[in-house]
Amino acid sequence: MTNPTRTSTQTDPGGGAVRGLSSYAQLTEVQLPAAGTFALITLTGGEGKPATFSSESLLGLQEILVEVAARVNSGQVAGVGITGQNRFFVAGADIKALKDLKDLGSARAVARLGHQVFGALEAMNVPTFAFINGAAIGGGLEVALAARYRTVSTDANAISLPEVYLGLLPGWGGVYRLPRLIGPANAVKVMIENPLANNKVLDGRSAYELGIADTAFDSPDFLSQSLAWADRIITDAARREELDQRRAAIADSSREEWDAAIAAGRVIVESKTSNAAPAPARLLDLLELGRSLDQAQSADLEVNALGELILSPQFKDSVYAFLELLQRRAKNPSGAPDPALARPVNKVGVVGAGLMAGQLALLFARQLHVPVVMTDIDQGPRG
């Protein structure tokens, strides 16, 4: 098969890539050998930083999706894909921006905006793809779930929905889409069990094995392999039907499967939090209520719940631990050594496996982009 070629880049009227305050979104036309024009959206935070979703960056992505939808509807585009850059797909929501929200109306508006933007990707009248090239955390994984098909890099090392760990829940569609993609039991594992197990994450192969991705490719040629696979899917109706039927069978999970998964989740929440943390219990309530609802009804529940949790003391405390305390002390440390003595940090070890240790590990991974190993006093390495 001839390799896909990029032919042009669409920009905003100002001549640059559409940009939000915390993320860039760039649209490139790729010519696929069989399918024709493919719209590839690349998200990046700029200057080597991972993309995150704030209101501004979501609106930037929405602007591009409106442009793409118009081209799709006029027959100019055969497929749509979204990917990231470097080692990151999307690093989730802009937590600092969420922390600054002061009222329920604003919090719910941000929750609703995520649904609107991701829904625009889902509603495209051509096959849609997420090429998960690296870390896909929280809202990053949720936007990937809004695509019809997904590829994942075998080198991706942080795929997760960690929201309950922070006092939130996956309120941009994850609560509805994930259990219908991988089954309720696996969804509880990803959304409840893993976050409460010191924020355990999936790697690319694990995500593929769970069914989050339809196929996995090695890193050096990940994008070109993903584009070639998309070309085959777009032009092979039988293959698309096979994937869709497999997905439909999982989405039609029995009442008993849902009951068992939710019950198992409640046991985990009780054992890990003694039911003192509202977010995981609220998530399980949404799963129980939403399993018989349509997507729009589930979205309303997610928006209300996420809005309330954004304003909760638990989330504010988590953000304080993540951002305020550590960053402020990093800027104004007491007894700091001479900066000339600083050396590059290539990896981090955290002794301890409790809540604070887990928060520190996640902070180091997000801010330093280096491997982090957690070791309990009486146990071996955990990550």
Give residue spans per PLM region.
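Hydrophobic alpha-helical membrane-association signature
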Residues: 57-61, 110-113, 302
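Long amphipathic alpha-helix in the N-terminal Rossmann-like dinucleotide-binding domain
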Residues: 305-316
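Hydrophobic/aromatic residues within transmembrane alpha-helices
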Residues: 82, 94, 143-144, 207, ...
